């Protein structure tokens, strides 16, 4: 299987449907601007964290799409249904879709910290 690239319009439909969106950039990159509601799961934490993501399709993003493509491939290899946004968060923002600067107000930062703790306990 190969992870599928989706355009911003399709990504928006998935986002509205409640599919899980993960931003695989570093926490500092994530804080500079990310898709509203996206979980911050840096690429290097993804293999261990994949088991704990909700059982729904997963949409990955990064700055421009490169790391998101790798993340979607990893998720696909782990048996998950994964897609990545062509052009990443940059394309999402250029389309005028919701972007948050700083940590997510709904606790997504806490979810990121959970992934970091989970990874350190697995090492």
Set out the residue ranges of the language-model regions.
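Rhodanese-like catalytic fold shared by cysteine-dependent sulfurtransferases
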Residues: 1-20, 27-57, 64-123
